[in-house]
Amino acid sequence: MLWVKVRYLDASALVKLVVDEGDHDYVRQFYHSTTNFAATSLCLAEALGAVKAKWSHGRISEEQYFAATRNLVINAWGGRIEIDDINLFTPQSLSSVESLAKRHSLDLSDSLQLATILQGKYAHLGPNSASVLVTADRKLAMAAESEGIRAWNCILSPAAAWV
């Protein structure tokens, strides 16, 4: 049986979708072969900033920079990557996000991603349809797993069937 699940892409995975790096193959193959991707608005902004840093430091050309940022924005704008996050601008949400950040020594962007998976739009889905975090960040993957979130480190191996 095939289960529907949402795959949340963190900033590191988003960057690998649009910038040629030596370890981008697994995530790109997976992205082009399946559906139901999401990211928080903050992760998308973080990814755009990371692409800018690569351009600013001469690691990619101006042409590559604009192609990468255009690709990210169009994928979000067109719905290929759904923008989904809990409202960070409420006392309860901020407290929840800060708590996750402090517990796992994460920044707000990473902890917002975890809080969104735990409390957001798709949090109610049953065990076989539970959302998955797609990341190239080992520390974030470990934090997600300790919170009961399934995580796939997209630079270590191809996607398993449960992703």
What are these regions (language model features)?
Residues 46-50, 96-97:
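A general alpha-helix detector
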Residues 54-89:
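Helix-adjacent hinge/juxtasegments
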